[in-house]
């Protein structure tokens, strides 16, 4: 395997055995590709903005005299970049400009004669843009649009599984779901009549819709029934015989022909009888006349002589009718073929209950159902029905819907019209009747072939179309109204409705969510989330068990493990590692093709529908070196079932063992040894880990850590290879390799790093360079680590030395005992950044003012403010301190004579303002790290704002001039090379100042051209620099666009350092969570024979009942990894020669049975080996991929190599007594996370505070400064003790007895500790509620 320069710094030993056929794809592609499709110009007009415009335009006027046509669109450049948008609190978006053409036709002239054409570009609002990491910045906060899993458009056949009717009869139904438009349902009722519903309204007999489509009764029966023909010959009744139709019936008469009796009366007709009839080629048999009674006529029979209708279609025949027909000369009678087995008389019965008999009455009936209470007219009824399913504006199946519709009806072509046709409706009814007759199956709604993904692009396009449709109405009005000669397209279009629709979607849609930014993994998981909730989806309350359950088609598409616990379980899922969506939006997963029993490396992506037809082998099937299966019988999946197949039946094989799980679950080592419920908790808790101050890579990982860290976008990744030319804390400069440069550029890449910024979850985002000067780098190398990454690998927690043993009850019920050393070494110290904002508004009584001159506040409180009244950077503040001084004018109050006198003497004005300063919230203390002041245009900036502005200008100028210097240096080095190669002596050049080099001329024409090109570039560079500087200056000095009525906003950022303490929640990666119970002194912790104490003591009883054995294996493997690190450390300390070091590390990498990773340290230079050893001295990182991890024997080998006991247990000694514990204890290294459930955020105490308005009880919760509820169970406890007075106090004065609590307060102040309980307010509420029901209750005083 070839390692790039940075990967060589620390190589993870991989225990994976299966070859990696397919690299992990880019993890954010589902978001980025979808949005790209939305905004890029699509010449076909299938997707995105183009499709939306084409579906609405051209807009014609009602008269048809003019139309507004769409030509093209373009997106402008965003005004601010992403970072500026976040600071200013605005949306990162680009203006959309659309070229429209207004065409006016001649009125009197023949059709299509153009009178005038006007073309113009029109502004149509702003379109939010996606950042490179798949997020949107809306009003300054990062948001993610979650993809939705919804029912695919098409037709679905389903049944109620016998739950609707009391008899338990199964009722079948069919539903046609369009992408947009009305739903059409067909359903059977318990009497086996077929009904139709439109948009889930009142049901009508299904034949109404056929009559509305202009079918007569005769045609309807013709469509759905086969015919039985009777002929009257010589006063005898003969029936045309199709033997197959008799199967299973009991003969009601002797069936005979040509004198031979085939079936005797009363006998059951069997397959043998039918074969005989067919063999003898019997076409007619004679039947008794009574046999025809009860049969149903298939068409109208008219007396040709009189024109009288003797027997209408669908009428039951009787012997009298038969006589009439015979008399009127009808010798051939067609009846409907029905039986109880597989040809039910459903449509015939439905025609009988159908109240309508022609097209008009059917249309009226439909109109009445859709618009109850409106008088129907013929035109209204016709246009309503036409618009329901047959109008392209109102109804669209979409390409997906048409494909699913045609597949369901077994048609060959998969493309077609987006509206329904007569055939579509009839075929759906036919298939539904077939299913009722026992032919065909109902669909599985939860099959992933029937559910599709709607991603960002598609949802944004739909919203945009909604906005356009709103505009369309207005445009039609305008085209009809006015004087078209003076109008331009710009006057027609109002961009407000469009931008409102888009803004509403991105700002407040259920699927537009505040990004979970705890750590890189939570970001990636959030972007790969798939929700069944949201508009057009399910609701939590209505979703049953089936929808939430794992389905066989989830394999490789949706993760069976990662889903939230609680009411959303199973409704919110996560995309599997390799899954992607196809052109129709269905999820597909990759497989390796198997041809003639050989597994090839050819990859095919299959959707859930296609997968059903194949036999697919598991990824862990054993192959020989030629790719043949080793075993004769292979475990495979086929049609959703798992079973054994012979090896020549296999069509495909899984790509990877981690194909099944999501990114979060693929980061859990030894996942295969954990119970699924605990794995779910483990995957969910990794997303809640807070980035620690010093990231520490996991010793035991799965090999996915690098992919997650790089794809999440929190690290700085090299766009092109080169060498590091300059590096400091805030920027890295790379001199690009010659072969990767574009012609005529300076060849310098500059990466500016993010420093101490606040994330959405108030954690700290900070990037730190991990390359040093002069290092060669390649494209894709990690240059700087972000939060929770270590040398380009995800590092959510810390490796802790853990022991599984009880310790004085301090780890009872999942508590965790932690050593003081963990706190001293700042292992779990985290930085949290809080943003506090102070807004100064214009009020009715005058403007609020930000000032240090605050009434009734002592000097001490103002000590941290500058003269503008804003706290200075670096101040240490605690709860209650003033950050920004602000005064608000208050209304003039009636002054007392004394105050008037004081006013007159001192000219005092202090009393007409009140203090409304921004203070630090209670319980928060930290350091001010940044202050930003935003001032409205036209309001004078205060001193602090000007200082900040000046600082920003200086910084911008410094940054840009440094950038210019670096680029200039790059350019001049190339000019130097050209001049020297063109014959100028190097010594002379060195003496000449750089600026004058360009004045030199060369004789070689080609070199001279190169020189001139470079000179041009130099000028362009300086010009560009001036332009950039000017733009920056403008942005910094211009006023800010603030909300109406706001004059100034001051934002103060506080950094809070949180050490770990009792009450904080910690967890491993296997769902093993707990709360810290005690921080123990180092000297009291259990230690081994060398005196090394453990960091954490966990309860061994937490393992067996929860069945997450993965944590034990991780502990053992972590111990081995650390043991090898210790040996390398010892060798480095003894300064042994590199050869020995190389040999030992090579042994460690080679260990393990047939592992896929091949590391050859002989190709490494001595320097590289030393650097590798330096990075391995704290432990050798190990990857044990999911379902393909290290085996027990390999862990033992590794322990042996590290000179450790293979049992994984060692003798420990009690730190307090020095005595040995009675048995060996499992000790090792486990990766522990600190979760974002910190005791500091939860601890809270209340004295007298706010009360609820209605019940007068104290509020609840920390945010409301609320109390703890003394609930039902606590009342029972006091009742059980008979503590009557305590109970009375709890229910009255301590809670909601208003008079009682004020009296109590007074009494306490007076030193008299008496209480006089009265009536609790909640009792009054109860009385009022009963009275509101009309029952009067009066309380009588005894």
Curated annotation (Swiss-Prot):
Keywords for the protein's UniProt record, in alphabetical order: DNA-directed RNA polymerase, Nucleotidyltransferase, Transcription, Transferase
EC number from the UniProt entry: 2.7.7.6
Coiled coil residues, start to end: none
Biological processes per GO annotation: DNA-templated transcription
Domain of life: Bacteria
Alphabetical list of PROSITE patterns matching this protein: RNA_POL_BETA
InterPro entries: DNA-dir_RNA_pol_bsu_ext_1_sf, DNA-dir_RNA_pol_bsu_external_1, DNA-dir_RNA_pol_su2, DNA-dir_RNAP_su2_dom, DNA-dir_RNAP_su2_hyb_sf, RNA_pol_bsu_bac, RNA_pol_bsu_CS, RNA_pol_bsu_protrusion
Keyword Nucleotidyltransferase found: yes
GO MF annotation: an example: ribonucleoside binding
Job of this protein: DNA-dependent RNA polymerase catalyzes the transcription of DNA into RNA using the four ribonucleoside triphosphates as substrates.
Complex and partners: The RNAP catalytic core consists of 2 alpha, 1 beta, 1 beta' and 1 omega subunit. When a sigma factor is associated with the core the holoenzyme is formed, which can initiate transcription.
Family of the protein in this entry: Belongs to the RNA polymerase beta chain family.
Name of the protein described by the UniProt record: DNA-directed RNA polymerase subunit beta
């Amino acid at each position: 395997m070839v390692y790039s320069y940075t990967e060589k710094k620390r190589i993870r030993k991989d225990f994976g055995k299966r070859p990696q056929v397919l690299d992990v794809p880019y993890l954010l592609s589902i978001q980025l590709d979808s949005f790209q499709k939305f905004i890029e110009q699509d010449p076909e007009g299938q997707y995105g903005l183009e499709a939306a415009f084409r579906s609405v335009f051209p807009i014609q006027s009602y008269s048809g005299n003019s139309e507004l046509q769409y030509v093209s669109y373009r997106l402008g450049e965003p005004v601010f970049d992403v970072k500026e948008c976040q600071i200013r609190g605005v949306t990162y978006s680009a203006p959309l400009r659309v070229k429209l053409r207004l065409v006016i036709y001649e009125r009197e002239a023949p059709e299509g004669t153009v009178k005038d054409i006007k073309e113009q570009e029109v502004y149509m609002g702003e379109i939010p843009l996606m950042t490179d990491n798949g997020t949107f910045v809306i009003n300054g906060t990062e948001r993610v649009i979650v993809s939705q899993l919804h029912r695919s458009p098409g037709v679905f056949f389903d049944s109620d599984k016998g739950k609707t009717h009391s008899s338990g009869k199964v009722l079948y139904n069919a539903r046609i779901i369009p992408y947009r438009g009305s739903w059409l349902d067909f359903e059977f009722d318990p009497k086996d009549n077929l009904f139709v519903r439109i948009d889930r309204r009142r049901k009508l007999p299904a034949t109404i819709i056929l009559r509305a489509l202009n079918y007569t009764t005769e045609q309807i029966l013709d469509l759905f029934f086969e015919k039985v023909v009777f002929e009257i010959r010589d006063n005898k009744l003969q029936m045309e015989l199709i033997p197959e139709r008799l199967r299973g019936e009991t003969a009601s008469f002797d069936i005979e022909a040509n004198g031979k009796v085939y079936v005797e009366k009363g006998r059951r007709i069997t397959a043998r009888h039918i074969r005989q009839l067919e063999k003898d080629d019997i076409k007619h048999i004679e039947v008794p006349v009574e046999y025809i009674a009860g049969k149903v006529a298939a068409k109208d029979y008219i007396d040709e002589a009189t024109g009288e209708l003797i027997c209408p279609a669908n009428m039951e025949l009787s012997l009298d009718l038969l006589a009439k027909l015979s008399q009127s000369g009808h010798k051939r009678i067609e009846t409907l073929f029905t039986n109880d087995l597989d040809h039910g008389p459903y449509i015939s019965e439905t025609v009988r209950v159908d109240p309508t008999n022609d097209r008009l009455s059917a249309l009226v009936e439909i109109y009445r159902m859709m618009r109850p209470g409106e008088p129907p007219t013929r035109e209204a009824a016709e246009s309503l029905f036409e618009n329901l399913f047959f109008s392209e504006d109102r109804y669209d199946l979409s390409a997906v819907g048409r494909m699913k519709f045609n597949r369901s009806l077994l048609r060959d072509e998969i493309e077609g019209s987006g509206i329904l046709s007569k055939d579509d409706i009839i075929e759906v009814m036919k298939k539904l009747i077939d299913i009722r007759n026992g032919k065909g199956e109902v669909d599985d709604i939860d099959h992933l072939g029937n559910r599709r993904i709607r991603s960002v692009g598609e949802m944004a396009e739909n919203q945009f179309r909604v906005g356009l449709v709103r505009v369309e109405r207005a445009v039609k009005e305008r085209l009809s109204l006015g004087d078209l000669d003076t109008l331009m397209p710009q006057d027609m279009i109002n961009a407000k409705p469009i931008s409102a629709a888009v803004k509403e979607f991105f700002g407040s849609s259920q699927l537009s969510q505040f990004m979970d930014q705890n750590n890189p993994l939570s970001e990636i998981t959030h972007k790969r989330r798939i929700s069944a909730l949201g508009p057009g989806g399910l609701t939590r309350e209505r979703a049953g068990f089936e929808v939430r359950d794992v389905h066989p088609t989830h394999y490789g598409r949706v993760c069976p493990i990662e889903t939230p616990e609680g009411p959303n379980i199973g409704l919110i899922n996560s995309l599997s590692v390799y899954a992607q969506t196809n052109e129709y939006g269905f999820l597909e997963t990759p497989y390796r093709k198997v041809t003639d029993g050989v597994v090839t490396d050819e990859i095919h992506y299959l959707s859930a529908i296609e997968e059903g037809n194949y036999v697919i082998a598991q990824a862990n099937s054993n192959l020989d070196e030629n790719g043949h299966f080793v075993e004769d019988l292979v475990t495979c999946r086929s049609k959703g079932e798992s079973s054994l197949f012979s090896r020549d039946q296999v069509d495909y094989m899984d790509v990877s063992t981690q194909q099944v799980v999501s990114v979060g679950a693929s980061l859990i080592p030894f996942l295969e040894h954990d119970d699924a419920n605990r794995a779910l908790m483990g995957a969910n808790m990794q997303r809640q880990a807070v980035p620690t101050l010093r990231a520490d890579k996991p010793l035991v990982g799965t090999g996915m850590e690098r992919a997650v860290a790089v794809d999440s976008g929190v690290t700085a990744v090299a766009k092109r290879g080169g060498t590091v030319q300059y590096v400091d804390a805030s920027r890295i400069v790379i001199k690009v390799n010659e072969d990767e440069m574009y012609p005529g550029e300076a060849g310098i890449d500059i990466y500016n790093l993010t420093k101490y910024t606040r994330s959405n979850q108030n954690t700290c985002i900070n990037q730190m360079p991990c390359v040093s000067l002069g290092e060669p780098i390649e494209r894709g190398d990690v240059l700087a680590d972000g939060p929770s990454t270590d040398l380009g690998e995800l590092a959510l927690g810390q490796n802790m030395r853990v022991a599984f043993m009880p310790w004085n009850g301090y780890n009872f019920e999942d508590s965790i005992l932690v050593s003081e050393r963990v706190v001293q070494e700042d292992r779990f110290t985290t930085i949290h950044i809080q943003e506090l904002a102070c807004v100064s508004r214009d009020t009715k009584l005058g403007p609020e003012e930000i000032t240090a001159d605050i009434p009734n506040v002592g000097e001490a409180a103002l000590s941290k403010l500058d003269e503008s009244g804003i706290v200075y950077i670096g101040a240490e503040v605690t709860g209650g301190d003033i950050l920004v001084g602000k005064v608000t004018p208050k209304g003039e109050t009636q002054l007392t004579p004394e105050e008037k006198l004081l006013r007159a003497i001192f000219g005092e004005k202090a009393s007409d303002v009140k203090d409304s300063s921004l203070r630090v919230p209670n319980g928060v203390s930290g350091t001010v790290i940044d202050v930003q002041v935003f001032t409205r245009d036209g309001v004078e900036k205060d001193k602090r704002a000007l200082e900040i502005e000046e600082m920003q200008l200086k910084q911008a100028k410094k940054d840009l001039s440094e950038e210019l210097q670096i680029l200039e240096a790059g350019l001049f080095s190339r000019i130097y090379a050209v001049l020297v190669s063109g014959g100028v002596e190097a010594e002379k050049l060195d003496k000449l100042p750089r600026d004058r080099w360009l004045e030199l001329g060369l004789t070689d024409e080609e070199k001279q051209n190169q020189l001139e090109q470079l000179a041009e570039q130099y000028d362009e560079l300086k010009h560009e620099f001036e332009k950039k500087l000017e733009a920056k200056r403008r942005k910094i000095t211009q006023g800010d666009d603030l909300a109406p009525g706001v004059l100034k906003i001051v934002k103060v950022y506080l950094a809070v350092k949180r050490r770990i303490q009792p009450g904080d929640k910690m967890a491993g990666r296997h769902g093993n969570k707990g709360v810290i119970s005690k921080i123990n002194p180092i000297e009291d912790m259990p230690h081994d024979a060398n005196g090394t104490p453990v960091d954490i003591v966990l309860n061994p009883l937490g393992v067996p009942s929860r069945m997450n054995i993965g944590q034990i294996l991780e502990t053992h493997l972590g111990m081995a990894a650390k043991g090898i690190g210790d040996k390398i450390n010892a060798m480095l300390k003894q300064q042994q020669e590199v050869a020995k070091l190389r040999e030992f590390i090579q042994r460690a990498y080679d260990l393990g049975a047939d592992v896929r990773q091949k590391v050859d340290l002989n190709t490494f230079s001595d320097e590289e080996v030393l650097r590798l050893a330096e990075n391995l001295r704290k432990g050798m990182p190990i990857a044990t991929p999911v379902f393909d991890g290290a085996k027990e024997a390999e862990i033992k080998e590794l322990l042996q190599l590290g000179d450790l006991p293979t049992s994984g247990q060692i003798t420990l000694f009690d730190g307090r007594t020095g005595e040995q514990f009675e048995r060996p204890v499992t000790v090792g290294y486990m990766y522990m996370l600190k979760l974002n459930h910190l005791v500091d955020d939860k601890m809270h105490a209340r004295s007298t505070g706010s009360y609820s308005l209605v019940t007068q009880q104290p509020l609840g919760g920390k945010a409301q400064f609320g109390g703890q509820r003394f609930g039902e169970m606590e009342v029972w406890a006091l009742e059980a003790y008979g503590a009557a007075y305590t109970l009375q106090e709890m229910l009255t004065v301590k809670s909601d007895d208003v008079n009682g609590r004020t009296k109590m307060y007074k009494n306490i102040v007076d030193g008299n500790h008496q209480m006089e309980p009265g009536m609790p307010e909640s009792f009054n509420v109860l009385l009022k509620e009963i009275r509101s029901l009309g029952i009067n209750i009066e309380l009588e005083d005894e």
